[in-house]
Amino acid sequence: MSSDNGGIIGVVNDPTSTVASGVWQQEEQYEAKVNDTWPQRALFTTKSLRFDDGSSDYLTKSVSSTSNRRTFTYSTWVKRSNLSGSNYPRLFNPFVDSNNFFDVYFRNTDALNIYSYSGGSENIDLVTTQLFRDVSAWYHIVLAVDTTQGTDSNRVKLYVNGSQVTSFSTSTYPSQNADLQINVSGVTNVIGRNQSGTNNYFDGYMAEIILVDG
């Protein structure tokens, strides 16, 4: 700490890329940031998974027992890389069969699509007007589902970077108390491609992929 830092006498502040100990005046911190010597927070890139559509990368997680199919929250951090790669790249795809599945993916327009198909009928189809084309940006995507809600638009809520998305080019909501094709015993949750494994590979980074039921 510097000798004029609030009257405290000590060694001169000398931050590194990872440590800035001691007592700091605001102007000292500002100057260190300007000089790019102030430690930066850990970025997701160093703690994320890299999905390469050219290498057909993906993850799977099997569901061991059926839990809440009406209320759940899915969240992830996503950073896209190749916008001209796979068609309709998948983020999350629990799949029972061709008549029963759940899907979170980017459309070819780069809109985000939340889709659910149960018993051969579509029960969720939300397509954002917002487009996700910034390959330098991390997007925090949170999907909060509660089909027990009385108001249809409250049954599926989408948040991007902390703000609720309310503008959709398509907006189909599930019926009240609908059981969705998620958290179903024996089903494999696929991350980074569709269940069939033939196409729709995601290209980019993902971090902190979380699914909470109830």
Regions found by a protein language model. Give the residues of each.
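Extracellular glycan-associated modules
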Residues: 4-6, 38-214
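Noncatalytic linker/hinge segments flanking ATPase motor cores
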Residues: 20, 26-30, 151
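Extracellular glycan-recognition surfaces and repeat-rich motifs
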Residues: 25, 31-42
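Compositionally biased, intrinsically disordered low-complexity segments
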Residues: 11-15, 22, 26, 37, ...
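Short, intrinsically disordered N-terminal pre-domain segments
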Residues: 1-19, 110
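Interface-prone segments of viral and bacterial extracellular assemblies
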Residues: 1, 23, 30-32, 206-211
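Serine/threonine-rich, low-complexity intrinsically disordered segments
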Residues: 18-20, 130-131
